């Protein structure tokens, strides 16, 4: 339901365009990983995935959203997974995500684990990834689809007052927004290498999206994350078969 709602509401707040790599697809049990820049970007990504590929993924989101009246019930109804960051329950989100993947549902997560603490609305490359994505992919054998979004901070960013003002004025401004969907890939079993490679793939997808909006940050060199087997270790998925867990 929330994916459909996002698809209807996002055009009211901005002008969304979507591109995809050749062969981009969301198969059952796929992990989708996107860059996180704003409270608005989950709606952009959900709308883009539904528009371009007809996908309605389970979203891993901050547990605090479940305390918002009415929203928590809607999130639970769609099977979304609360993430209790910084607590002993944080790892439980990956267990629930694995169950969703096993049932054939795609799962959308944000490997940065937070919105960057910046006040300006301009774009910046994705921050360092946490290891949850690599561990989930390794445990389930799921393919990973990198997604880059740009423009969400034009809707809302910065402190509370600025965020509210951005949302209220967005329907008048209707900023340009762009989402780019990458081709599915397999991550190596080594967690640091897998994390670095996934970060690189999302960064490239983000760069494509930011370039589409004419963002100057798209041309900024990004330091290579540590870890062996950098870009050459990404295995793009050519067939439709899935790797079994532990393979």
Question: How would you label these PLM feature ranges?
Answer:
Residues 5-36:
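Helix-to-loop junction immediately C-terminal to a conserved catalytic motif
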Residues 27-86:
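Catalytic core of membrane glycerolipid acyltransferases/transacylases, capturing the structured
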Residues 29-31, 104-110, 145:
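Residue-level preference for the first positions of well-ordered beta-strands
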Residues 74, 99, 135-137:
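Hydrophobic/aromatic ligand-binding patch that stacks against planar heteroaromatic rings
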Residues 87-91, 126-127:
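A conditional alpha-helix N-cap/helix-loop micro-motif detector
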Residues 100-134:
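Catalytic-site beta-strand/loop segments enriched in glycine and acidic/polar residues
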Residues 121-190:
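A cross-family acyltransferase "interaction/gating" segment
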Residues 223-247:
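Acidic, Ser/Thr-rich low-complexity intrinsically disordered segments
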């Amino acid at each position: 339901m929330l994916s459909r709602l996002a698809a209807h509401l996002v055009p009211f707040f901005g002008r969304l365009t979507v591109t995809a790599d050749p062969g981009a697809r969301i198969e059952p049990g796929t992990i989708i990983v996107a860059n996180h820049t704003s409270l608005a970007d989950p709606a952009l990504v959900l709308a883009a995935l539904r528009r371009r590929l007809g996908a309605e993924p389970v979203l891993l989101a901050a547990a605090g959203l479940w305390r918002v009246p009415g929203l928590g019930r809607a999130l639970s109804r769609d099977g979304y997974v609360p993430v209790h960051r910084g607590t002993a329950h944080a790892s439980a989100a990956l267990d629930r995500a694995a169950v969703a993947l096993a049932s054939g549902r795609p799962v959308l997560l944000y490997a940065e684990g937070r919105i960057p603490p910046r006040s300006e609305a301009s774009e910046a490359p994705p921050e360092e990834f946490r290891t949850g994505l690599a561990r989930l992919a390794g445990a389930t054998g799921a393919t990973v689809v990198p997604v880059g979004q740009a423009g969400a901070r034009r809707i809302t960013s910065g402190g509370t007052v600025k965020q509210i003002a951005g949302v209220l004025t967005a329907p008048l401004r209707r900023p340009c927004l762009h989402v780019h969907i990458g081709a599915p890939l397999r991550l190596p079993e080594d967690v640091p290498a897998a994390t670095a490679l996934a970060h690189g793939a999302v960064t490239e997808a983000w760069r494509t999206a930011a370039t589409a909006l004419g963002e100057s940050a798209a041309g900024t060199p990004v330091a290579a994350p540590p870890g062996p087997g950098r870009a050459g270790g990404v295995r793009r998925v050519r067939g439709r078969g899935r790797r079994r867990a532990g393979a």
